[in-house]
């Protein structure tokens, strides 16, 4: 499976793994699956750390580099096709990061791993729910 991690799933996988369901934990641990991360999630984490919403035991850039290596993360490209797909992403809330994740999952044919129920209601994207 080709899986795009929502930002909170990526963070929880290291900082709060108990928040992941056993199914999601098993699937993320399966080395046959590809784990993808959007640059938007990297930006979102940096913002959360700067605003003190997330606390890390090390520098944010070091944490990101370690996480990318530990999880064998692939970079999901922010392409023109993704930007163009954004116009079709309608969410109840206006979180631009979520819109980018949905558009990326659609364009790159990835399954979005999320606990966000709003994203679970979106048509045209495969979801692996963490609930």
Regions found by a protein language model. Name each.
Residues 33, 73, 125:
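Short, conserved active-site loop motifs that form the nucleotide-linked donor/cofactor pocket
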Residues 45:
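Phosphate/NTP-binding elements of NTP-utilizing enzymes
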Residues 57, 61, 69-117:
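Active-site neighborhoods of divalent-metal-dependent phosphate/nucleic-acid chemistry enzymes
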Residues 118-125:
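Short loop/helix-cap segments at secondary-structure boundaries that form the rim of catalytic
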């Amino acid at each position: 499976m080709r899986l795009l991690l929502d930002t909170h799933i990526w963070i929880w996988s290291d900082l709060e793994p108990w928040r992941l369901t056993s199914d999601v934990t098993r699937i993320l641990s399966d080395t046959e699956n590809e784990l993808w991360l959007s640059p938007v999630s990297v930006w979102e984490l940096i913002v959360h750390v700067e605003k003190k919403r997330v606390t890390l035991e090390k520098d944010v850039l070091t944490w990101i580099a370690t996480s990318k290596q530990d999880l064998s993360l692939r970079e999901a490209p922010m392409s023109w096709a993704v930007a163009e797909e954004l116009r079709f992403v309608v969410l109840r809330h206006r979180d631009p990061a979520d819109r980018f994740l949905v558009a990326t999952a659609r364009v790159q044919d990835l399954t979005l791993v999320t606990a966000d129920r709003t994203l679970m209601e979106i048509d045209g994207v495969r979801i692996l729910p963490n609930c």
